[in-house]
Structures are given as structure tokens and as C-alpha cells.
UniProtKB/Swiss-Prot annotation:
Disulfide bonds: none
Xref: HAMAP family: Exonuc_7_L (MF_00378)
Enzyme class, first EC level, given as a word: hydrolase
Task of the protein: Bidirectionally degrades single-stranded DNA into large acid-insoluble oligonucleotides, which are then degraded further into small acid-soluble oligonucleotides.
MF terms in GO: exodeoxyribonuclease VII activity; nucleic acid binding
Subunit structure: Heterooligomer composed of large and small subunits.
Gene Ontology BP annotations: DNA catabolic process
Transmembrane intervals: none
Location of the protein in the cell: Cytoplasm
Catalytic reaction annotation: Exonucleolytic cleavage in either 5'- to 3'- or 3'- to 5'-direction to yield nucleoside 5'-phosphates
Protein name per its UniProtKB record: Exodeoxyribonuclease 7 large subunit
Keyword Cytoplasm part of the UniProt annotation: yes
EC number: 3.1.11.6
Source species of the chain: Exiguobacterium sp. (strain ATCC BAA-1283 / AT1b)
Length: 448
């Protein structure tokens, strides 16, 4: 046994089944009115009954306004209704859309019988319905030349799609000749083969006035058409068999014209929107370009070109001066560095030696002068000068030797060397070298 369901869920399920039943969406019900009451809102509530059953019915004010008689209790009527359920009470009731006094019941019976037959034959199936063309070039109209339907359709087409051509087939839309003329016009439109979509219809009326569009000859012509057909018969509450067989049903002739040009109108609006956007974009670009040109025209440079050239020359002269000053400053710095490097060799110690030797020479010269003859003194002086020259740093350098200085101090042996750069003094200049390895004696090697 399935799980129990709440009452509201059962009611919703039953209502959904009723609403989904195509036959119950619009059915003509014959019965006698009882308990009729019209409220101030305009809505009418009553019961339809026969000898065996009764059903609650409601007719809303928008439909009640179309009544051509005043309903009363005991009156026998035919009510075109939708069968549904009122969820609050769970009552199955009729939503009456159209109601007429009985007397034309045979027409409704024929209508309902033929409707069931066509539905069983599949003539109402959505699968067989043809789609409307997106951009029709020619629209065919089958209607009366005297009614308002033609004016409404043509006016709407010209307003929404003025480039679309119209082919009009004038026919009678009620009376004995209406059905054969409408069917013949539909076939003629198909023989032309230049129409992209057909609108078949007329304005509203009674069931007798609309009956031509329930006749088999018209229904069969619509079914056989290779051109998509929009049925626009009567008002929104009027339904004919032509409406069910046609590819699309329109509530009014004006609505039919709108459906025929729906995509055209949408594309037109898109084009207008894009055109406005493009216009705004172009105007914005033009305004920006105009402003830029005006700024250039009003700039001081264009108004006074001599002043602009003078400014350029002044900036060039300043750049030239800065370049010359920079070169001089660089040359001064280089000269100073060169002097510092040339003075890095430590000659103070040799200067002291030379001074001491000079004093000794002078002393010896004085002694020789006093104690020896001049020739012997001269010889000794020459010998001393030779010895002095032998120990002179310049003499050492002239024989191919060099002096090494590191961090401003004279290097006398390998162990004094440290990692980094050293200055090597030659007879004719100096060089900078990097100490990478120390070798003490013949065997000991020290990596820096």
C-alpha cells in the first residue's frame, strides 16, 4: 500500500489531470440554470443541471459582459466551458467562457462531434503543424473586403513590416457561399506559391455567423495547405475547428498580423538599437577628435612657432653645456685617479736613504778635502756616487726589477701579501694585479 497523501496533494493531482485533458479545456455543456447570482464584481455563479447530475459553474465578468441575454433560473443554455477543479473545496466546476440560450444545440453537437473526430485523426497534433517563416516577403490574406479584419491586418503589416508584399483574396465570411469561397481562396494561394504565410479569418460573431470556419471543406483546405496558416476567426473566446487545424491560432486579426511579422519587428528593433548605438559611438569619436583638433589649434606652439623653435634651441644649448661639463668632470676625476695611482709607490724610505747617503758623501768629501789630495777625493767621490746609484730604486727598476705595493705599503716578502689587488711599479709605469696564490720557497703553496 502506498504512503498516505495529504488532501491538498490529491486535489492538486486531480486538478492537474483535468487541466491537462485537451477535451476538457473547451467543451459545450447543455443544462438548466439554477441558483444563478451575479455579484457586484460582475462575476456570475450558478449551477448547471440535468435530470441525472449537476455541476457548479462560474462566469467571470470579462466573459459575462459578452452575454446577449440575462440568465435566469430554469433557463436551458449551452455553456462553452473549461472543466477544472477549485482547490479550496475540491469541487469540480465549469469555467464558462461563452453561454447561449438553447435552440442551436444541434450546431454545438455537430461541432463537438466533428472536433472529437478530427482530434482522433491527429489533425490537431502539434507535430504536423508548420512553423511560421522568420522573415516573410509576401503575406496572403483571406477575409471579407468589407469587414474590419482586412483593415486591421493590413494596417498592422504596413506599420511593422512595410516592405512585405500583400496578396488579398476577397471572400464571404458568413452565409452559404462563405465556406466554399474560403476553401477555394486557400487553394488558390497555394497554387500561386509566392506567399510565405496565410492569414485566414474574420471578426467576431455568433456561432451561426462563424459556422463557415467549422465546415469540412474549409478545415480540409487548411489541413492540406503547404503554406503555414494563421487562423484569426472571431474574438479571443471564439473557437472554431479552423483554429484547431491551423498551424497557429491568433486571438484577433491584429494579433495574426503581429505573429506573421514577429521576427521582422524584432529584427527591426535590433537594427534600430544598433543604429542608435553606432550613431552615438560615431558622434562620440567625432566630438573627441574635434576637441583634440581644437586643443592643437589653440596651443601656443601653433600660434607662435618662433617661440617654439626658440625653446627647442635653448634646450639644445643647455644640453650641450651639460654634456661639456660632464666630460670635463669625468676627465678631472680620471686625472686625479691617475695621480693617486702614480703616488702609490712608497718612496719615502728611499728618500731617507738618499738623504743619509748624501750626508755621508758630503762628510767624506770634507774629510778627503782635509786629509787627501784632491784626485784621491775625487775618485772616492765617484765610487760613492756609483754605490749610491746602485742602491737607488730607479736603478733597480732600470735593470728589469719591480716594486710591489699593497694597501699603501711596500711588500718585502711573500708572506706580507694578502688577497686582493696589488700595484706593480715598473721603470716606465705601473700596473694593477690580483693575488690569487702565494708560493713560499720551492714547496710550500698557499691559496689566497
Amino acid at each position: 500500500m502506498a504512503n498516505p497523501l495529504p488532501v491538498s496533494e490529491v486535489v492538486r493531482y486531480v486538478k492537474r489531470q483535468l487541466d491537462d485533458d485537451v477535451l476538457l479545456r473547451q467543451v459545450a455543456v447543455i443544462g438548466e440554470i439554477s441558483n444563478f447570482k451575479r455579484y457586484s464584481s460582475g462575476h456570475c455563479y450558478f449551477t448547471l443541471k440535468d435530470d441525472a447530475s449537476r455541476m457548479k459553474a462560474v462566469m467571470f465578468s470579462r466573459d459575462a459582459k459578452q452575454l446577449q441575454f440575462e440568465p435566469k433560473d430554469g433557463m436551458k443554455v449551452i455553456a462553452v466551458s473549461k472543466v477544472t477543479m477549485y482547490e479550496a473545496t475540491g469541487d469540480v466546476q465549469l469555467y464558462v467562457e461563452l453561454m447561449r440560450q438553447d435552440g442551436i444545440g444541434l450546431l454545438f453537437e455537430r461541432y463537438e462531434a466533428r472536433k472529437r473526430e478530427l482530434e482522433e485523426m491527429g489533425w490537431f497534433d502539434d507535430e504536423r503543424k508548420k512553423p511560421l517563416p522568420m522573415f516573410p516577403e509576401r503575406v496572403g490574406i483571406v477575409t471579407s473586403p468589407k469587414g474590419a479584419a482586412l483593415h486591421d491586418i493590413a494596417t498592422t503589416l504596413r506599420r511593422r513590416a512595410p516592405h512585405v508584399a500583400i496578396t488579398f483574396a476577397p471572400v464571404a465570411v458568413q452565409g452559404e457561399m462563405a465556406a466554399p469561397q474560403v476553401a477555394s481562396a486557400i487553394r488558390w494561394m497555394n497554387e500561386r506559391t509566392d506567399c510565405d504565410v496565410l492569414i485566414v479569418g474574420r471578426g467576431g460573431g455568433s456561432i451561426e455567423e462563424l459556422w463557415a470556419f467549422n465546415e469540412d471543406v474549409v478545415v480540409e483546405a487548411i489541413y492540406a495547405s503547404t503554406i503555414p496558416i494563421i487562423s484569426a476567426v472571431g474574438h479571443e473566446t471564439d473557437f472554431t475547428l479552423s483554429d484547431f487545424v491551423a498551424d497557429v491560432r491568433a486571438a484577433t486579426p491584429t494579433a495574426a498580423a503581429e505573429l506573421a511579422t514577429a521576427m521582422i519587428d524584432a529584427q527591426r528593433k535590433d537594427v534600430e538599437r544598433l543604429d542608435n548605438h553606432l550613431h552615438k559611438a560615431v558622434r562620440s569619436q567625432l566630438d573627441e577628435s574635434r576637441s583634440r583638433v581644437e586643443r592643437m589649434i589653440n596651443s601656443y606652439g601653433l600660434k607662435s612657432p618662433r617661440y617654439t623653435i626658440s625653446q627647442k634651441r635653448e634646450r639644445f644649448a643647455q644640453s650641450e653645456i651639460r654634456l661639456e661639463q660632464g666630460m670635463r668632470r669625468h676627465l678631472t676625476q680620471a686625472t686625479h685617479q691617475l695621480r693617486q695611482l702614480s703616488q702609490q709607490l712608497d718612496v719615502k724610505r728611499f728618500s731617507k736613504t738618499l738623504s743619509k747617503q748624501g750626508d755621508e758623501v758630503n762628510h767624506m768629501v770634507e774629510r778627503l778635502r782635509r786629509t787627501r789630495p784632491l784626485e784621491q777625493a775625487t775618485l772616492q767621490f765617484a765610487q760613492q756616487v756609483g754605490r749610491l746609484h746602485a742602491v737607488s730604486p730607479l736603478a733597480v727598476l732600470s735593470r728589469g726589477y719591480t716594486f710591489i705595493e699593497q694597501d699603501g705599503a711596500y711588500v718585502q716578502n711573500v708572506k706580507q701579501l694578502r688577497d686582493g689587488d696589488v700595484s706593480i711599479r715598473f721603470r716606465d709605469g705601473h700596473a694593477i694585479a690580483e693575488v690569487k696564490e702565494r708560493i713560499v720557497g720551492d714547496e710550500e703553496r698557499t691559496d689566497i
